[in-house]
Amino acid sequence: MKTKEIVDDVTMKRAITRITYEIIERNKQLDNVVLAGIKTRGVFLARRIQERLHQLEGLDLPIGELDIKPFRDDMRVEEDTTLMSVDITGKDVILIDDVLYTGRTIRAAIDNLVSLGRPARVSLAVLVDRGHRELPIRADYVGKNIPTSSVEEIVVEVVEVDGRDRVSIIDPT
């Protein structure tokens, strides 16, 4: 098994900053935006984007934490630990996750969102898009496009959970 670091902490910070600038440019009414991080690492990325938006625009956007486990199509979990402090009805919700792969996580996140309210618009921001979709889903904001083979794995580490910021690719062969 081979592991290769493909994004270091500095590059990750730049990617998050780039996503933040794109959010500012594409959303004329930032005061109508709600950030929704997908647990676990998507929540920490959402907090970093929220912090950058505050630094750049002086805005304190609301942020929620989406638990997709109860909405997945491959397992059943009863407890939903979603935290959404604001009504998302009529809001522009930006889903935030670490890796976009098959699209199934995002489908589950959208199912969770519509159970909470009826957003005006839903867009998607991801740190890494690795391809290999099984569903017709694409990201609106992408930090890094990293094409992979189907046997490779992308591992995102964030300092809040893993003690460091980096993205690695693991080749099991």
Swiss-Prot record:
GO annotation (BP), single: DNA-templated transcription termination
Residues that hold substrate according to the record: T40, R41, D97, D98, V99, L100, Y101, T102, G103, R104, T105, R130
Annotated EC: 2.4.2.9
Broad class of enzyme this protein falls into: transferase
Catalytic activity: UMP + diphosphate = 5-phospho-alpha-D-ribose 1-diphosphate + uracil
The keyword Transcription regulation appears for this protein: yes
Entry-linked Pfam families: Pribosyltran
InterPro entries linked to this entry: PRibTrfase_dom, PRTase-like, PyrR, PyrR_bifunctional
CDD domains listed in its UniProt record: PRTases_typeI
KW Metal-binding (keyword) present: no
Family: Belongs to the purine/pyrimidine phosphoribosyltransferase family. PyrR subfamily.
Role played: Regulates transcriptional attenuation of the pyrimidine nucleotide (pyr) operon by binding in a uridine-dependent manner to specific sites on pyr mRNA. This disrupts an antiterminator hairpin in the RNA and favors formation of a downstream transcription terminator, leading to a reduced expression of downstream genes.
Description of how the protein assembles with itself and partners: Homodimer and homohexamer; in equilibrium.
Annotated HAMAP family: PyrR
Name this polypeptide is given: Bifunctional protein PyrR
Species name: Streptococcus pyogenes serotype M3 (strain ATCC BAA-595 / MGAS315)
Lineage, broadest ranks: Bacteria, Bacillati, Bacillota, Bacilli, Lactobacillales
